[in-house]
Amino acid sequence: MNEFAQEIVDFDNKAKKIFFSLYEKFAESAKQLDRKKDDNVFQQQQGKYLNTLKTQLENLAQDLLNKYSSLKNINLLNKKLRDEINIYLNEFRQKSRAL
């Protein structure tokens, strides 16, 4: 079995809710922009939401690291959670470009 599978599932279940909530808010705010005229505003909005997503996911990861602090290889779990955060951030960027 995959090491830390349950911990990653725990993270993903909560992270998905954060991701989709923020993405929906971003998509709604982006709808009001004309991308040709307001691309700089779009980029600023995207950056704001990306930073918020990153912060919230990092806080979630830290909470889980604290919860599972007695595990061996906690540094490996930390790396896996950071990898997961980067996946969510890249997904947000890709979905944003499609708007």
Identify the function of each model-found stretch.
Residues 19, 23-26, 30, 34, ...:
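Long, hydrophobic, amphipathic alpha-helical segments used as structural scaffolds
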Residues 6, 13, 25-28, 44, ...:
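Intrinsically disordered, low-complexity regions enriched in small/polar residues
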Residues 39-79:
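Acidic, low-complexity, intrinsically disordered interaction modules
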Residues 1-37:
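Short terminal alpha-helical segments
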Residues 69-99:
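Amphipathic alpha-helical binding modules
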